[in-house]
Amino acid sequence: MGAGGAFIGLGSGAVLANPLVKNNSISTKGEIWKWSKEAEYYVQTPRGPKCQLCPNECNVKEGEPGDCRTRVAENGKLYSIAYGNPCSANIDPIEKKPLYHFFPESRAFSVATAGCNLACLNCQNWQISQKSPKETRNYELMPNDLVRKASENNCQSIAYTYSEPIVFYEYMYDSAKLAKKQGIKNVMITAGYIKEQPLRNLCKYIDAANIDLKSFSNDIYMRLNAGGLETVLNTLKIMKEEGVWIEITNLIVPDWTDDMDMIEEMCNWLYDNGFDDTPIHFSRFTPMYKLKHLPPTPASKLKKAREIAFSAGLKYVYIGNLPGNEGEDTYCPNCKEKIINRRGFYITEKHITGNKCVHCGETIAGVWG
C-alpha cells in the first residue's frame, strides 16, 4: 500500500514522488503534537474527556490512548493524533474500494492513518489498523496538500480507506470539505461504527461509501469484530437518508459468517429497508491475522450467497476476491443482459449509456459521471 517509503506506488507500475515525506516514525511527544488536532466530539467527565465519536465512548486518561489508538488526553482536552500523517497513500482504480457503480474507471487518491475502533480477528490491514500513529512510518500530507496532489494526479476522488477512516475523522472531514470546494469527490471505505451526529455532519461532504456489513448477528459482531450490528445498520440508514451513494461488502468467513440462513436474513432486511438497488459485494475470505487456521471461503458458498441475494430481491450482487467468476460483472436487473464486463478492477466491456442499459433502456442505479 505504499506506506513508509519515499514513493507512493501506483497500480499502473508508475511511482509518485510523495510531498513532504517524513520517513522517520513520529515517536516523541513533541513531534506527535505537530500532527494533532483537538477532537470534534467529546464531553468532559470527572474521569477525563469522554469520546463521543463512536459507540465505544472511551474515557481517555492522560498517557493512555482510546481503543482506536488515535485519541489522547492532554490538560483535560481530547486530541486526535491522526491528522495530516497518513501511513499509507496510493492511487487506485475506484473499483478496488470496491465501488462498482460510482464513476467507474476513475482514479481515487487513497489515504489512511494508523488506528481502528474495531478489533477484527480477520483484519487484512492489521499492521496499520492495530497500531497507533506513533508506531507507524508516516507521510506528512496536510488536507490542502492531499487535495492538491489528488488534483495534480487527475484523481476524481479522494478515498479514505485501508484502516478505518472514522478514527481519523478530523483529517477526513477537513480534507473532504476542501476537496468538495475543488470539485473532487470524497469516498470512504468503513465499517460504519460511528455515532449519529458526527456521521450526519460528515455526510455533507461524502459522496460515496462502501460499508463493511460484517455479519447479521450482534453476537458474532462482538466476538469477531469487537463491535455491534445495530450501529452499522443505523449508519446504512443515515447515509442513505443523507444522499450518499452506498455499496455494501459482506466478507464470508468460514465458521463465522457463512451461515446461509443469516445471509438470507441480512438480504431480506436490506430489501425491506429500501436497499434493493444498493450493490452488495460478497467477498472471499483468505486466511489472515488471527484466523490463519481457517480455509479460504469455498467458491460454492459465495455463489450460494449471491443466489440468495438475488432471490431476496437485491438487484446488483457481486462476488469479490474470486477472479474470473461471473459475479465480477454487472447485469441489467430487467433484461438480465451483461452490461459491464470486468477483469479484476478493470472494465473490459461496457453496454451502458449514461445510466441506461443499452439493451432495454432500464435505469441502472449508481453515479455514472
Residues covered by each model-derived region:
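A C-terminal junction/extension of Radical SAM enzymes
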Residues: 294-344
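N-terminal [4Fe-4S]-dependent radical SAM core
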Residues: 29-50, 56-112, 127, 338-340
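Conserved, mostly hydrophobic/aromatic
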Residues: 120, 211, 317
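N-terminal export signals
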Residues: 1-21
